[in-house]
């Protein structure tokens, strides 16, 4: 589904270089120290950064130079980027038509995702009238209503309390499994990664330093566990 082949981006003349393959329907966590290049990797996939070299394939098609708006990708950030002057219904509708002129089919898609997110009763409210968790549900709904096969999450739930964060992670995982979406999620928490991502990637110094089973990383048995401050549980 998703393949990066020597995708390179120059950061202060120092190259970050990524080679990666992710299958359709996989849920993968991206972990690593602060400043390692995790968000850079997602931004390269989404098209917000242009690589200096390399190839990016999605579903077998070359999207190395495709503008972000035309890539088969949706991305959700920690800052949800909801428009404060638009209500929930309109914010979700932006994912279908920036002009907010929706046909009957699009209106049904909008309403269906709102029901799935549990926010159908909030459709006439403005973002400022919502809790943090509700705002992230609206932002996630706007991503999912686009029906793109790849979903990128850049720590969108890190500001939520542990109970809400776990609730959102479970919701995302269930939807991705139901729709066979390919998920890549940046996180600082290996525990969060283990909840939804059987596979993890560790980024360090602008490279993929390790990839494998999240459980192995969490147990301290992986070579990259020390990068995340995880010690082996074996005495």
Curated annotation (Swiss-Prot):
Membrane topology: Peripheral membrane protein
Binding site for ATP: 32-39
Source taxon at top rank: Bacteria
Keyword field contains Lyase: no
Residue ranges of domain ABC transporter in the record: 2-230
GO molecular function, one term: ABC-type thiamine transporter activity
E.C. no: 7.6.2.15
Assembly, per entry: The complex is composed of two ATP-binding proteins (ThiQ), two transmembrane proteins (ThiP) and a solute-binding protein (ThiB).
Descriptive protein name: Thiamine import ATP-binding protein ThiQ
Organism, as annotated: Salmonella choleraesuis (strain SC-B67)
